[in-house]
Structures are given as structure tokens and as C-alpha cells.
Amino acid sequence: MKKSQQSALRRLAVTTLVTIASAVTAVTTQAAYIVNATEVGGDVVFEGSGSIDTAAWSFNADRNRSAFVQPNESFTVGASLAADYYSGAFSGPATIGPGTAFTTADSRTGDYTGINWNFPALFLPSGYVSGQPIAGTATYAAATFATLGITPGSYQWTWGSGATADSLTLNVGAVPIPAAAWLFGSGLLGLVGVARRKARA
């Protein structure tokens, strides 16, 4: 392969990788709150992080709550007992499993955050500022998805439109890989293939 061809291939590779990386970054930095629930060492652990835009919601009241899950109604994470309750409207699933029991987490950390799809309502840390990064966990000792009454899968609630559009996602079990990540992997494989073909030429 001539040096000019090698240089052109390198430029193509760099340009492609930068484009793909930008797409991945755009996906991961979009305002949203994501909770991943996993079975770990005989426990079930909910881990949430992100931010929430409250522009499409109305502050309702202060509440004192502890992290819990009730599959047919709501779930929350976080250690703070003091929380702000927001009312509004959103689209999303009406259940995350067949269970109906209210189960309080055995241990919890971080910012109190959650959703109730029956009211509907959002629970956020007391004094929460819209768009502020938050994170929280809830651990259910000696539990499984089945004993908590939740079904593995991905659940998403969305609200607002345009600049105020936002979402809360709960992934129960395996965490899905974003489409941009698949694009990134496909791009890398494609570049490897091109390089090999050029090398043989």
C-alpha cells in the first residue's frame, strides 16, 4: 500500500471515529434519569443517576418517604426521607411486574428519586433544582426480581416536548446497549475490514 493511501485511510478512520464518538456522547449526555436494577449476591440493587427537567411538572407538596418498590404503582431510590412531590402527565407503562406488595428497601444511599405512574407523580430530593445531577440506590436483601414481583425488561416514562422533553428509565436485568454504541462497534469492525483489504492489495 502506498503512503498516500495509508494516510487517506488513517484520515478516514479518524473522521469516522470522531463522528461515531460524537453520536455516542450526544446519547449519553441527554437529560434523563436512568435506574438499573440487578440481582447481585442474593440481593436486588437499584442504582439510579442522571437529571430531571421539571418544567413540565407542578410542585405539589413535601413528603417524607423511604426507598421502596410496588410493581403495580411506583418505585423510588435514595436515602433522603424529605422529598418533593411533583404532579403532571407522562406516557409509559402502568406496571413493572405482577407484584402488588409494597416493599421497603433494606438499605439506601444518595438522592431520593422515583416515579408513581398511577397518580401520576415524580418524587425528587427536597429543594431539587431542575436539571441538577442526582444519584441514589436502594438494596433489597435476600431478594430476587421474582420475590419483589417485578419482571425483567426496560421501562420508560416520558414527558414534556421540545426543550422540556425528558424521561425516566428503569432497566430490570440486563442493561440494553444504546443504538449509538452498536453504531460505534459496527464502525470499528468496518474500519478493520477496510484496513485488511487495503493491506492485501
What is the predicted function of each stretch?
Residues S7-I34, S161-L189, R200:
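Short, threonine-centered small-residue motifs that mark membrane-proximal processing/anchoring sites
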